[in-house]
């Protein structure tokens, strides 16, 4: 009986995690699309440089200041640096 209740609880938690993962993927798709738009705008107006480390640092610091989760700031930095890098490299390849 207890095992069945545990499985049901785990199943509900996993469904919620899956929904969050779906939302995160959708937001990543939106983000990369906007980065592509920004890079195209820069290319068309010669407003370089395309990569701005100061902007990346600003984004990461802002997100770290908003962090209220158990995730440590260095993990927030790593996650978002990876996201920023993936979006930028995708935009640059197009």
Predicted feature residues:
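Domain-level signature for soluble enzymes in the chorismate/prephenate branch of the shikimate pathway
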Residues: 1-94
């Amino acid at each position: 009986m207890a095992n069945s209740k545990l499985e049901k609880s785990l199943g509900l938690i996993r469904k919620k995690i899956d929904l969050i993962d779906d939302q995160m993927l959708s937001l990543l798709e939106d983000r990369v699309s906007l980065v592509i738009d920004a890079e195209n705008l820069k290319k068309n107006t010669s407003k370089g440089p395309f990569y701005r480390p100061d902007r990346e640092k600003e984004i990461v610091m802002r997100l770290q200041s908003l962090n209220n989760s158990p995730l440590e700031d260095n993990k927030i930095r790593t996650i978002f640096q990876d996201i920023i890098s993936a979006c930028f490299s995708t935009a640059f390849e197009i």
